[in-house]
Amino acid sequence: MKITPVKALTDNYIWMIQHGNHAVCVDPSEPSPVLEFLVRNRLMLAQTWVTHPHPDHEGGAAALWRGYMESPVYGESDIEAATHTVTAGTQFTFGDGQVTVWATPGHTDRHTSYLLETSDGIHVFCGDTLFSAGCGRVFTGTIEQLYDSFQRFNRLPENTLFYPAHEYTAANLDFAAHIEPDNADIQTALKAAAHTPTLPVTLAHERRVNPFLRVDLPHVRDRAEALSGKTLNSSLDTFVALRELKNQYRTK
């Protein structure tokens, strides 16, 4: 199985998953990059997966379905183009992989992640929940939901690969360095992010550089307290403070 990012809009990635001469597209913000990829690689669209109902994630799903009516569109009931409604725990297959739907709200009150389990491990298509070195903004969800989604991700095996839908890594690492200026892993990742695409990322990597997965560490909590001016009594408090600080932060 081969997984390829296809650039779309300004900073979106539409993830294309190939097995034989069939493909899945994840979060098609627009149809043309997907169609071009399919034609160039002589592939048939087998499935479309949508994580949440924002135009830059579902905008191309209806047009793709009209072109490939035999290919299902998976998404929750608020995804207008969905032909196959999913909920937490829904399972289906693609190629030799098993797909399990997780509810990972926070960015939106209903947000789906798709866990694809293959012989080489777990691949998580996480939309706007987790970004490399960061997390999604809270729109219609709650910060508590987002924290719970991160806690759940953090229980996966460390070699799990995450496939966010945006390339925000450099800006997120800049903020991470603001929180942990002495973290050598963040400095190394910053240098790498300046020269090459950064996705996908392993959970092991994110545990080293993503402040939102490091809220249990005393020095991260202390730094968040110092910058926010608030007393933080729990990991959730630290997560909330970091998200508020990130909202206000301007990349250098």
Curated annotation (Swiss-Prot):
Pfam families assigned to the protein according to its UniProt record, in alphabetical order: HAGH_C, Lactamase_B
Known EC number: 3.1.2.6
UniProt remark on cofactor binding: Binds 2 Zn(2+) ions per subunit.
Biological processes annotated in GO: methylglyoxal catabolic process to D-lactate via S-lactoyl-glutathione
Gene3D superfamilies: Ribonuclease Z/Hydroxyacylglutathione hydrolase-like (3.60.15.10)
Residues noted as binding Zn(2+) 2 in the record, renumbered to the chain: 56-57, 128, 166
Reactions that this protein is recorded to catalyse: an S-(2-hydroxyacyl)glutathione + H2O = a 2-hydroxy carboxylate + glutathione + H(+)
EC primary class: hydrolase
SUPFAM superfamilies in alphabetical order: Metallo-hydrolase/oxidoreductase
Pathway assigned in UniProt: Secondary metabolite metabolism; methylglyoxal degradation; (R)-lactate from methylglyoxal: step 2/2
Domain of life: Bacteria
GO MF terms, alphabetically ordered: hydroxyacylglutathione hydrolase activity; metal ion binding
Keywords, sorted A to Z: Hydrolase, Metal-binding, Zinc
Required cofactor names: Zn(2+)
InterPro entries, A to Z: Clx_II_MBL (IPR035680), Glyoxalase_II_hydrolase (IPR050110), HAGH_C (IPR032282), Hydroxyacylglutathione_Hdrlase (IPR017782), Metallo-B-lactamas (IPR001279), RibonucZ/Hydroxyglut_hydro (IPR036866)
Family to which this protein belongs: Belongs to the metallo-beta-lactamase superfamily. Glyoxalase II family.
Subunit structure comment from the entry: Monomer.
Record's function text: Thiolesterase that catalyzes the hydrolysis of S-D-lactoyl-glutathione to form glutathione and D-lactic acid.
Matching PANTHER family: HYDROXYACYLGLUTATHIONE HYDROLASE, HYDROXYACYLGLUTATHIONE HYDROLASE GLOB
Protein name: Hydroxyacylglutathione hydrolase
